[in-house]
């Protein structure tokens, strides 16, 4: 009976190696194709955003005037006649059109001005340092240079409440009264622990980076602008033209970056606010939403102080 033994020098079949090489080749081609597709989509998105942003200036011209406040211009829109002049300051990341339903009605009885903080709406970007203290200084210069005379009634929403309080403390003779609409008090920030603040800042930083990149490639414009009216409470009170303009202008990369910068600097002027002079015997109205944040009792306590 014969037995067969394999030679130690026998060569393995080349088929498995060939299949492996073929698989690696096709995998590389697929990955390269996906990379090329991603680059193409990114370039197309960036081009789309650039083209649309160029057209925004033509489609949505500023309703007011641009006033130089020291190296950059701020947008100021005033209507109506009478005194005192009402100055409307929008909330975090918002601009003058947020008052689109309020300003025309209030202007039937007095002078009403709405403005855009630096980098928002139609205003040009300003210094990198964005804080309520900086906002108050720029607002005072804006009103002075534009020729809008006081005394002013300051109407401030959200984070702008800090700006209004600093403005009133620094220029008491130019303020006739104040209306705070869901204004944020510095004590709300101070009740958070260092761990909570750090966690909040980390989450915001991650969110900021994601939104910035989405905006640069046109994704925010595509997704946010059409959806804005359906997710923003009170938007039904605005005209269709105003709703469209807000959705488009808020989706621009510049708008988003400056809005995020405002949020990052939300606590920068808290020490000044703690020592700010009170409004005294001048009229003060505090408006709070019936559906507010979870720490509303704490907010109410300090808004009455």
Predicted feature locations:
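Gly/Ala-rich beta-loop-alpha elbow adjacent to hydrolase catalytic centers
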Residues: 156-160, 164
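Flexible "cap/lid" subdomain of the alpha/beta-hydrolase fold that forms the substrate-access gate
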Residues: 132, 174-175, 179-305
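Active-site signature of alpha/beta-hydrolase-fold catalytic machinery across serine-
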Residues: 166-170
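Conserved HGGG/HGGXW glycine-rich cap/lid loop of the alpha/beta-hydrolase fold
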Residues: 72, 78-122
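Alpha/beta-hydrolase fold catalytic core
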Residues: 2-84, 108-110, 305
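Active-site loop/oxyanion-hole signature of alpha/beta-hydrolase fold enzymes
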Residues: 77-79, 117-155, 171
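The conserved beta1-alpha1 loop
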Residues: 87-91, 157, 182
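Conserved catalytic-core motifs of eukaryotic protein kinase domains, centered on the activation segment
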Residues: 98-100, 123-129, 190-191
């Amino acid at each position: 009976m014969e037995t067969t033994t394999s030679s130690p020098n026998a060569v393995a079949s080349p088929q498995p190696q060939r299949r492996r090489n073929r698989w690696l080749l096709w995998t590389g081609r697929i990955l390269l194709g996906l990379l090329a597709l991603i680059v193409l989509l990114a370039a197309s998105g960036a081009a789309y955003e650039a083209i649309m942003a160029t057209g925004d200036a033509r489609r949505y011209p500023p309703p007011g005037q641009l006033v130089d406040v020291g190296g950059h211009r701020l947008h100021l829109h005033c209507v109506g006649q009478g005194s005192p002049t009402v100055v409307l300051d929008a909330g975090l990341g918002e601009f003058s059109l947020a008052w689109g339903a309020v300003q025309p009605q209030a202007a039937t009885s007095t002078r009403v001005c709405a403005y855009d903080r630096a980098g928002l709406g139609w205003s040009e970007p300003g210094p990198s340092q964005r804080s309520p203290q900086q906002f108050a200084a720029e607002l005072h210069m804006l009103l002075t240079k534009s020729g809008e005379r006081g005394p002013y009634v300051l109407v401030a929403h959200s984070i702008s409440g800090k700006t209004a309080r600093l403005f009133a403390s620094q220029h008491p003779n130019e303020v006739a009264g104040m209306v705070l609409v869901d204004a944020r008090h510095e004590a709300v920030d101070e009740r958070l622990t260092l761990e909570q603040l750090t966690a909040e800042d980390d989450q915001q930083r991650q969110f900021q980076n994601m939104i910035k990149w989405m905006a640069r490639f046109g994704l925010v414009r595509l997704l946010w602008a059409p959806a804005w009216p359906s997710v923003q409470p009170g938007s039904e009170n605005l005209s269709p033209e105003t709703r469209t303009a807000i959705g488009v202008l808020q989706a621009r990369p510049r708008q988003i970056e400056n809005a995020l910068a405002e949020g990052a600097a939300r606590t920068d002027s808290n020490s000044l606010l703690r020592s700010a002079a009170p409004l005294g015997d001048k009229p003060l109205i505090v408006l709070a939403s019936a559906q507010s944040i979870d720490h509303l009792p704490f907010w109410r306590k300090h808004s009455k102080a």
